[in-house]
């Protein structure tokens, strides 16, 4: 009875263990892409437990008899039923570890393992019946055939063009693989440099063509300027006319509004300069002190200070005549010829001399 109780407890524990594993399997199925190996291990454990339960139910009588004999004093040979699948997997793992221990010095196998873990997705779906060597060859083939279809991280791979591969194929027939890889890299680098130089030359040619295709600057000939002035006179002056109106009046082929506008601005600046110079000259002339000339003891302003008659009439100024000192000879002659002097002489002559 005690043996049957122990057996029932073991069966109950196995059922509970299977249920717990099934719950974990449901949780891991959500992250099937991220945790494929964990999901595979859990499913294998569930299958092993179920096989153990099915095997134990069919052989309950045999186990009970063996256990009763063991209780009676006989030796116990087996307590658990061995599982072929798990044992075979353990043996394969041990063999792989031994082979890896023999070939630890080769760095290529280490790199292959890393690439297997990073790139391969179907490594854990292998069949247990294959030999370790065949399994390793199948893994390598799968790594080569896998194509990046998902959005996961992929290592950077330089794109090699067909034109760059042609010289590399020719060199491969006469040189080993190590030298061919170096030559392909150098050829690819040279071709990239040549392409970059060609692009720069093409850009420079386009820029030079754009400079040549630019419109030349307008040269304003005397005839063109005369038309410009006629248009200004008809339109009412440079401050009233607009560039568009001037261009319409001039009727010149190829003349643009911008060219007329720039010429109009230059003309306005040119017409403003004489007015500014005349105002500056007047201001400097007013600041100069008047000059005087001494004539016969009288201060007389110089002729430069007198404006012309037209200016006098325009300004409306009044000027008085200036008496100029005469020479002494002419003054004596005039005094002799005057009637007062003659009468005085006559009286002097008529009076008797005492």
Curated annotation (Swiss-Prot):
Deletion phenotype: Reduced number and length of lateral roots.
Induction remarks: Induced under phosphate deprivation conditions.
GO biological process: cellular response to hypoxia; phosphate ion homeostasis; regulation of DNA-templated transcription; response to abscisic acid
A cellular component annotation (GO) from this entry: nucleus
Compositionally biased tracts (Low complexity): 337-354
Start-end of Basic and acidic residues biased regions: 103-112
Domain named HTH myb-type: residues: 212-272
DNA-binding region boundaries: 243-268
Region of interest (Disordered), ranges: 93-112, 324-354
InterPro entries membership: Homeodomain-like_sf (IPR009057), HRS1-like (IPR044787), Myb_dom (IPR017930), Myb_dom_plants (IPR006447), SANT/Myb (IPR001005)
GO function terms (MF aspect): DNA-binding transcription factor activity; DNA-binding transcription repressor activity; transcription cis-regulatory region binding
PROSITE patterns recorded: HTH_MYB
Location of this chain's protein in the cell: Nucleus
Keyword set includes Magnesium: no
Biased composition (Acidic residues): 93-102
Keyword annotations from UniProtKB, A to Z: DNA-binding, Nucleus, Transcription, Transcription regulation
Top-level taxon in the UniProt lineage: Eukaryota
Function: Probable transcription factor involved in phosphate homeostasis. Involved in the regulation of the developmental response of lateral roots, acquisition and/or mobilization of phosphate and expression of a subset of genes involved in phosphate sensing and signaling pathway. Is a target of the transcription factor PHR1.
UniProt protein name: Transcription factor HHO2
Organism: Arabidopsis thaliana (Mouse-ear cress)
High-level lineage: Eukaryota, Viridiplantae, Streptophyta, Embryophyta, Tracheophyta
């Amino acid at each position: 009875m005690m043996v049957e109780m122990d057996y029932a407890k073991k069966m109950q524990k196995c059922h509970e263990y299977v249920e717990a594993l099934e719950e974990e399997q449901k949780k891991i199925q959500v992250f099937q892409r991220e945790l494929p190996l964990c999901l595979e291990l859990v499913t294998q454990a569930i299958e092993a437990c179920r096989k153990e339960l099915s095997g134990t139910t069919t052989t309950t009588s045999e186990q009970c008899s063996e256990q009763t004999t063991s209780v009676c004093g006989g030796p116990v040979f087996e307590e658990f039923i061995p599982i072929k699948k798990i044992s075979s997997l353990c043996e394969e793992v041990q063999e792989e570890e031994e082979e890896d221990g023999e070939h630890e010095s080769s760095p290529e196998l280490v790199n292959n393992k890393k690439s297997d873990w990073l790139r391969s997705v179907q490594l854990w779906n292998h069949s247990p019946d294959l030999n370790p060597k065949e399994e390793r060859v199948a893994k390598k083939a799968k790594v080569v055939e896998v194509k990046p279809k998902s959005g996961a991280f992929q290592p950077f791979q330089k794109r090699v063009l067909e034109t760059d591969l042609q010289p590399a194929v020719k060199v491969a027939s006469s040189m080993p693989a190590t030298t061919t890889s170096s030559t392909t890299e150098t050829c690819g680098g040279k071709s990239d440099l040549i392409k970059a130089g060609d692009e720069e030359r093409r850009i420079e040619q386009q820029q030079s063509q754009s400079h040549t295709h630019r419109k030349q600057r307008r040269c304003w000939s005397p005839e063109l300027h005369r038309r410009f002035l006629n248009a200004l006179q008809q339109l009412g002056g440079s401050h009233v006319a607009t560039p568009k109106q001037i261009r319409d009046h001039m009727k010149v082929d190829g003349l643009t509004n911008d060219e007329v506008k720039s010429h109009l601005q230059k003309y306005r600046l040119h017409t403003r300069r004489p007015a500014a110079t005349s105002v500056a000259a007047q201001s400097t002339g007013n600041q100069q002190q008047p000059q005087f000339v001494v004539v016969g003891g009288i201060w007389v302003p110089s002729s430069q200070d007198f404006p012309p008659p037209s200016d006098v009439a325009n300004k409306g100024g009044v000027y008085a005549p200036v008496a100029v000192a005469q020479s002494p000879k002419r003054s004596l002659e005039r005094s002799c010829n005057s009637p007062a002097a003659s009468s005085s002489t006559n009286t002097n002559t008529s009076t008797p001399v005492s």
